[in-house]
Structures are given as structure tokens and as C-alpha cells.
Amino acid sequence: MTQFDFKKLVDAEYLLNNRTNNNIVVIDARGGMLEEGSLMYDKAIVVDWTDISLLGEFGGEELGKLLSKKNYQQIFSKLGITDESEVLVYGFTMPEQGFGDEARVLYTFSYAGFDNVKFIDGGFKQVEKLEFNKKYVPTTDRIDVSDIVRSEATQNEKAIYTDELLSKIGNTDVQIIDTRLEAEYNGRVIYGENKAGHVPGSISLPFNSLVDSNGFLKSRAVLEKYVTDKGLDKNKLQITYCTTGVRASYVAVILEELGFKVLNYEPSFARYANVGEVVLD
């Protein structure tokens, strides 16, 4: 049951009630983590975060950045998104699986000027219960962006990059939020970063701690108390990071809804570990 009153969040019943609505575009954001033959919603298009982001070397400055608005218009055309469309996105059901990819889509499309995007609370486990499923065939069910010549976003007002981040470490008007797992914050390398640890002074706020055991976003009151107890201050700028900016996008979307000013460090810790000081508390 949806507990968080957020206009960008709907339950699976909303998807069911709009099943015959031709203006609805459904995105399965599980992307490359979805194995061939796995169940998916029968009207969905599979999109990976790498399909809608700049590519580059792991640990470089480019990987994880958003694309140009021209690129997103090309992607919208492939997805069948028009000005009349409403996009519904689901991902894996956290906390067991997933990285909050559904909110990464929302974050990305918002930059591109398309705001009529909602993500489905509880993830695919709730969608699956609707019983309108099919088996995933990558060659036909995943978006093909191979013909798009990618270029970098400009004037991305909700992102921050490495040089600016480095200049803000230690700034008392800024709080840096590590959205990775607590184990990663404490020094475990899971996804191949060059160093273990975290950005000096950063606060650990794991992305999947925002959902309950069934994968539903916790209530506004519970989340407000949680982030306050973590020390987050609405009078300060929040900067979120993870490994390549996906989990950080999820937390950024929720924090913004809670009233925080947030920037997402898109190259994230994969890049930072190559150029910045890393600490273990």
C-alpha cells in the first residue's frame, strides 16, 4: 500500500486502471539487470540507465552524465512519447533488488523537459500481481539506441560535477550524502571503485533505506524524521552521490520532494575515487 503522498508516485492499481489508455507509456527500468526470459509487464519497454546516459570509461568524468535534449527527443520518439503521453516506470522491488532506476528515469526525463512521469510504488513485485506479464526478449523488448550519436547535457541545473564538488568539501553550507549501502560507505568495494571508503564529511543515507520491507516508500512523516535524525538540514545544499549516479538520483528525487535543495553528483564515487581524498571513519 502506498504510504507516501507524492504526485510522482502511484500504486500498481493505477497501472491497471489505465491499461487501455493509449496515452500511457510504460517503462521497465530494470534494463540490463533483467535476464532473458524473466517476466515483465506485457506493454512495457525495457530501458537501462545506460540507454539514456552518456557513456565513458568507468571512473571517468563522462559516465553517468545526462544526454543532450536533442538526444532525449530522439529517445522519446523511439519510446512513443508525445506531449500527450504519461509515462509510468517500475523497477525491481527494493530493498532486496534494484538501484532505484525508476527514479533515475524521472530525474532524466525532467531534465529533458518531460515531467509527466510517475513511478510505481513497490516495484515489479506489485506489477507482477496484475497478471499481465510476458517473458522478456531483449531483441524486441528493449529500446535500441545504437543509432543515436550521444552528446552531453548542457545547463543541467540539478547536477554537479567533480571540480565543483571538490570545491564544496568542508563547506558548512553543504551536506554531501552517500546513498550507497552502508557497507560501501564503511569501506567495502562492491562495484569496482578505485578506492574504499567515502567522501570526507559525507553522511550515509542508503538509497534502499527509504523503503519498507515490502518495497514501498515509507511515509512522509517517517522519512522526515529519518533524514532529520541523520542530520540533514533544509537550509543547506544537499549533494547526493553513489557509484555512477543512479542510486543518488533516487535519493535526490525523494529529498527534493521533502523540501531539500539537491544536486546529484552524476559521475559519482567511481570518478571521485580516482581524484579525491577518501576516508574511512
For the regions a protein language model found, what residue spans apply to each?
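Active-site neighborhoods of enzymes that stabilize oxyanions during catalysis
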Residues: 1-12, 17, 124-200, 277-281
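Hydrophobic alpha-helical membrane-insertion signals
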Residues: 12-34
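Loop/turn elements at helix/coil->beta-strand transitions in domains of secreted/extracellular proteins
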Residues: 22-24, 83-86, 172-174, 200, ...
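Short loop/helix-cap segments at secondary-structure boundaries that form the rim of catalytic
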Residues: 34-41
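Helix-loop module immediately N-terminal to the HCX5R catalytic loop
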Residues: 54-86, 207-238, 276
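Thiolate-centered catalytic microenvironments shared by cysteine-dependent enzyme domains
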Residues: 63-163, 247, 251-270
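C-terminal soluble interaction/assembly domains
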Residues: 225, 235-242, 246, 252, ...
